[in-house]
């Protein structure tokens, strides 16, 4: 059974407060099982005061610009944030398993409250087939139980789900706006293929928001 790509957004992170931090990749933070396969997020340790400064909740994003050849690329990693008073203020500690991704064991970075992240989840782990847009379900991420509301998704050919189309089947309908069509002129309409508002085994991506 194929994985669902579950995209989780945090509606409370619209006004993020980025801050410069020093990141250290250390031995006492272990890589998480399933981390490399995208089934969970890596863990970081952060001082409670740094976490408060970032306005972070359970998740923190660390971002750097890394030189690759003749160009700079953005590297962004989302973490499960665990508080530790032993970590100095202004620092974030994470696993040495991320050295290759970041390119160094100590570096300056920008950190902020995570806006959204994606996980690969086995369909057998979460029984979402038959659920519809607006339904809630619980997903555990690194021991954190998240209450999630389904907001949309897409199938294995990229056709998006629409909340106003009943059922799980594909339909060709006249659209005036997203999802499924973005007009370039006022009043423009097009017939497009979309999925209904019910999740089937043909869905590959499920979009959700955290409900508190």
From Swiss-Prot:
Any one Gene Ontology BP term: translation
InterPro entries the UniProt entry points to: Ribosomal_eS6, Ribosomal_eS6_arc, Ribosomal_eS6_CS
Molecular function GO terms recorded: structural constituent of ribosome
Keyword Ribosomal protein: yes
Pfam families in alphabetical order: Ribosomal_S6e
UniProt KW Transport keyword: no
Record-linked PROSITE patterns: RIBOSOMAL_S6E (PS00578)
UniProt keyword annotations, A-Z: Ribonucleoprotein, Ribosomal protein
GO cellular component terms listed in the entry, alphabetical order: ribonucleoprotein complex; ribosome
Sequence similarity: Belongs to the eukaryotic ribosomal protein eS6 family.
Name of the protein in its database record: Small ribosomal subunit protein eS6
Organism taxonomic ancestry: Archaea, Thermoproteota, Thermoprotei, Sulfolobales, Sulfolobaceae
Gene: rps6e
């Amino acid at each position: 059974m194929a994985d669902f790509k579950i995209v989780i957004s945090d509606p409370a992170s619209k006004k993020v407060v980025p801050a410069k931090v020093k990141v250290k990749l250390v031995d006492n933070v272990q890589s998480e099982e399933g981390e490399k396969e995208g089934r969970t997020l890596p863990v970081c340790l952060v001082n409670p005061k740094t976490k408060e400064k970032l306005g972070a909740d359970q998740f923190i994003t660390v971002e750097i610009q890394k030189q690759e050849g003749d160009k700079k690329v953005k590297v962004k990693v989302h973490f499960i944030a665990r508080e530790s008073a032993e970590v100095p203020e202004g620092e974030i500690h994470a696993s040495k398993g991320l050295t290759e991704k970041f390119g160094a064991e100590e570096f300056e970075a920008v950190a902020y409250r995570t806006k959204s992240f994606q996980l690969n989840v086995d369909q057998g782990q979460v029984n979402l087939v038959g659920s519809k847009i607006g339904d809630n379900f619980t997903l555990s991420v690194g021991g954190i139980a998240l209450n999630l509301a389904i907001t949309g998704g897409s199938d294995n050919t990229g056709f998006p789900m629409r909340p106003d189309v009943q059922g799980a089947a594909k339909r060709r309908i006249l659209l005036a706006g997203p999802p499924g069509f973005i007009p370039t002129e006022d009043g423009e309409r097009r017939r497009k293929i979309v999925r209904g508002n019910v999740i089937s085994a043909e869905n590959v991506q499920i979009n959700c928001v955290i409900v508190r």
